[in-house]
Design a protein with these regions (language model features):
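Sec-dependent N-terminal signal peptides
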Residues: 15-25
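Generic early N-terminus positional signal peaking at residue ~5-7
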Residues: 6, 16-17, 34-35
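Positively charged n-region of N-terminal signal peptides that target proteins for export
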Residues: 11-15, 151
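Sec/Tat signal peptide C-region and signal peptidase I cleavage site
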Residues: 26-30
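Subset of outer-membrane beta-barrel
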Residues: 31-325
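Coiled-coil-like amphipathic alpha-helices with heptad-repeat character
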Residues: 8-9, 24, 36
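Short, Lys/Arg-enriched N-terminal segments with co-localized hydrophobic residues
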Residues: 1-11
Length: 325
């Protein structure tokens, strides 16, 4: 029995190592900014959203971080459920849910789902004559496995299926997220690497297949020893060098007031650039790119809240609630 268990652990370790090797060995061409399934770019974790909308390196008991780096579920308490709500554009409804469970001391699995409903919209002809209404919805389902490769390094993979419905048109896609994470408790350094949305459409809206939003990311976090301050820097869209380095950088800072409470703030250069609006001779992002948030832990319950801007027409509030059974 001992040798059987040891063999299974070695096989899991080799499988995860081989899969994660693809993260660094696959050369990816730059992709166009026009992609389908762009709702997969929206943040789910309120803590990550507060730190600029992208963070793959903080080491926290936060079940929603699996949407950002699958390796991070290894730090989540066994049998944890998480619910998410996000305000987005007017008339839309956005949410997500996840469940995480430990297999043993080194392995964890989880299930996730997310959706966005754009509500009812007017259907018009080319000459702007109304012909009725239609609805649009996006959603994705996924399963995650993570494994502790060493004392300090974990690897994870999420396989997911996504679908999009726009009136009587629909599209489907399959993809995987690959992630690695390093954490040293003594030095309080942590590093993450992620390849998100590796895959593509398996059914197009019409005849032409479109890309899905592939995103290669590298991040680092460091808590100052003896201080409540922790700083994070994340490089995003490393597969697309159409932009300058400043637009690829996401910065965030945590003030860890206690084990039960934190406040956070961040800045996302890419988001600020994409949402700039011109008015006469002036161009302004109107606060886009800046984000704030806070979180607290009460025994088995955790509550995280973040505020940011992810659409030119409105600001967003993200709320995570998790409970450990």
């Amino acid at each position: 029995m001992y040798f059987c268990r040891q063999y299974q652990e070695e096989m899991m370790k080799k499988t995860v190592l081989y899969t994660l090797f693809l993260l660094f060995s696959t050369m990816v061409k730059a992709q166009d900014s026009e992609t389908a399934f762009n709702f997969l770019r929206l943040p789910v974790s309120a803590h990550a959203a507060a730190l600029g909308g992208e963070n793959i390196s903080i080491c926290e008991d936060d079940a929603a971080l699996v949407f950002h780096n699958p390796a991070l579920i290894n730090y989540v308490e066994d049998r944890t459920m998480n619910l998410n709500m996000m305000t987005y554009m007017q008339g839309t409804l956005t949410g997500a849910a996840s469940y995480t469970q430990a297999i043993n001391d080194r392995a964890t699995w989880g299930l996730q789902g997310r959706f966005i409903s754009y509500g009812e919209m007017k259907q018009t002809t080319y000459d702007n004559q109304e012909t009725g209404t239609f609805r649009a919805n996006d959603f994705a389902l996924g399963g995650t496995f993570a494994y502790g490769l060493t004392e300090h390094i974990s690897g994870g993979i999420t396989a997911k299926w996504a679908a999009s419905y726009i009136g009587h048109y629909n599209s489907m896609a399959v993809a995987v997220d690959l992630g690695m994470h390093y954490f040293n408790e003594e030095s309080q350094w942590s590093v993450g690497a992620v390849a998100r949305n590796l895959g593509g459409q398996i059914k197009a809206y019409e005849d032409d297949f479109e890309r899905i939003p592939l995103d290669l990311q590298l991040g680092v976090s460091k808590r100052l020893i003896g201080s409540p301050l922790r700083f994070s820097a994340t490089l995003v869209r490393l597969n697309d060098w159409e932009y300058g380095i400043g637009k690829h950088l996401v910065l965030g800072a945590d003030l860890l007031l206690s084990e039960q409470f934190y406040v956070a703030a961040g800045y996302n250069g890419m988001r600020a650039s994409e949402m700039k609006i011109s008015s006469g001779d002036d161009t302004s992002a109107h606060g886009a790119g800046l984000s704030l948030g806070a979180g607290m832990t009460l025994e088995r319950m955790k509550l995280h809240v973040a505020y940011g801007k992810y659409h030119v027409s409105s600001t967003s509030l993200i709320i995570n609630f998790s409970y450990t059974l």
